[in-house]
UniProtKB/Swiss-Prot annotation:
Record region (Disordered): 208-228, 255-383
Start-end of Polar residues biased regions: 355-374
PROSITE patterns named in the record: BSD
Highest taxon in the source lineage: Eukaryota
Gene3D superfamilies: BSD domain
Bias-annotated ranges (Basic and acidic residues): 208-219, 255-271, 340-351
Residue ranges of every copy of the BSD domain listed in the record: 146-198
Protein name: BSD domain-containing protein 1
Comp. bias intervals (Low complexity): 272-287
Amino acid sequence: MAEGEDGTWWRSWLQQSYSSVRDKSAEALEFMKRDLTEFTRVVQHDTACTIAATASVVKDKLVVEGSSGTTDKVKKGLSNFLGVISDTFAPSPDKTIDCDVITLMATPSGTTELYDSTKARLYSLQSDPATYCNEPDGSPAEFDAWLAYWDPEHRKAEISELLVTSPSIRALYTKMVPAAVSHSEFWQRYFYKVHQLEQEEARRDALKQRADQSVHSEEPQWEEEEEDFVGAASAPNFKLEEKYVISPPTIPTLHVEDKSEKMAELNRDHTSITSPSESSESISPITQIANPEYIEQTATKESSPRPLTVKEKNGAGTDESSAHAPVEQITGKSNAQIGTHREDPPSDLRVFELNSDSGKSTPSNNGQKGSSTDVSEDWEKDFDMTEEEVQMALSRVEVSGEVDDEDWENWE
């Protein structure tokens, strides 16, 4: 009993499973058949529409003259094929390509004309549905101000011409009015877009004219600036030539007014008085230059010693007599001697040249040649003078007759 019941249960389960699988498979098969049928119908419909559209385009665009023969048939088939390709890839007549390289563009009427950026933007604006559906760009206040002067009665003729000549405007007007927008809104938005386009073109033209005027106005200014620069550059050359004319050299006159230099001269005279032998052979450069005869005498004195002359003896005698003279008279005479040397500018110039020469040899106190001494020692030797040497030098000048008595009286 139990085994029979188990067998019937398994049999019934298998039958139920088989029936459920069969039902599900039938349903899936029905779905597949229905999908395939629908897909086939859609493909057939699309193919038929494409063939019909291609045939209509070829019929409208290509006109083949009636002829006979195989060549004409080949030409006809080739022209049909090329017409389909051109219609597939070419834009519609109311569309334009805004590109500066293209020199021809299609008009809404189906013809071509020379490319113009303004007209190209206008044709693109006419074929754009956003021109009529969306609100105008810019501030609403400007749009309201423009609407205050908007009068549709004055635009009736222009509206009629646009509907006749522009297929894109006519198609959009048919679709949108009155389903999407009203008649007044359609034309208000269109003409306001045209107004904005005209304003933009006017601004571009003004900027272009301003740029051209600036270029034309700057060119002559550059030429004038170049001429001014050339003139300004040439004028200083003549001034420089006149300015830097070399003048003949002039020997400046040196005026010794410093008290230190006066004291140096006094000290030099004092040293010549204390040592007569030294002053006789090594006299200051001023005395050597002022007395050219003495230069010739010193040349002979250096070669051989000489005895004292009568003038020198007289000078020694006068030194003893004049030793008791007041100091003021001595200083006055020394100043007079300095004044006589000041009146001779060339001698002063030579004195400075001789004193500045530091490397030359000067005769020593004993009359020997070739003993080089330092500049500082020479100055000390010149400054180391006593009153006797000063009196000796003054008496020598009086005997030689270089200074007149009238000059001495004037100096005193």
